[in-house]
Amino acid sequence: VGLRIEPNNHKAIFQLGNIYLMEKNYSDSIKFFDKSIKIKPNFWQAINNKGLAYFEENNIDRSIKLFERAISIEENAEPLLGLASCLRTKDIKLAVELTKKALNKNPNYVDYEYRKEQLWGEKLQTSTETLLKNEQLQRDVILAKSKINSSS
């Protein structure tokens, strides 16, 4: 009903994309994210979530481009960590650097359940969990967890 009243509401269209993402219907989620981005080209959240969907479809190269584009608009923790997870097997040095930056911006991303609430799929979650076990990140992971615990 809301979209019939306001068909160019990029946020409403984005939320429909998120519903499809939660239902693991990645192709439809991507279509809605595309519509949202067409209306508002710098809507980094839709660009980011399109990257999440492509990761679950094993299209890592496309995810990388989308996360990089989202970061170029808004250097937010979510696309930083998404990109880091994509690069985990390609460039571990850069992946570690991006992870440190992401956890510094928002320590909540160290938490599996928090990422799940942000609609991260199983494949990206698994990749991120592996990345967070990297020896070079242990101090950052502990620090992020302590920041979460001290704020709750």
Describe each model-derived feature in a short phrase.
Residues 1, 22-35, 56-69, 91-98:
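Structural signature of tandem alpha-helical TPR/SEL1-like repeats
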Residues 10-11, 26, 44-45, 60, ...:
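Helix-start (N-cap) detector for alpha-helical repeat units in TPR-like alpha-solenoids
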Residues 15, 49, 82-83, 118:
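Canonical tetratricopeptide repeat
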Residues 19, 53, 86, 119-122:
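TPR/TPR-like alpha-solenoid repeats
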Residues 68-77, 81-111, 133-137:
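TPR/TPR-like (Sel1-like) alpha-helical repeat modules
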Residues 104-152:
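Terminal, low-structured helical/coil segments at or just beyond the last alpha-helical repeat
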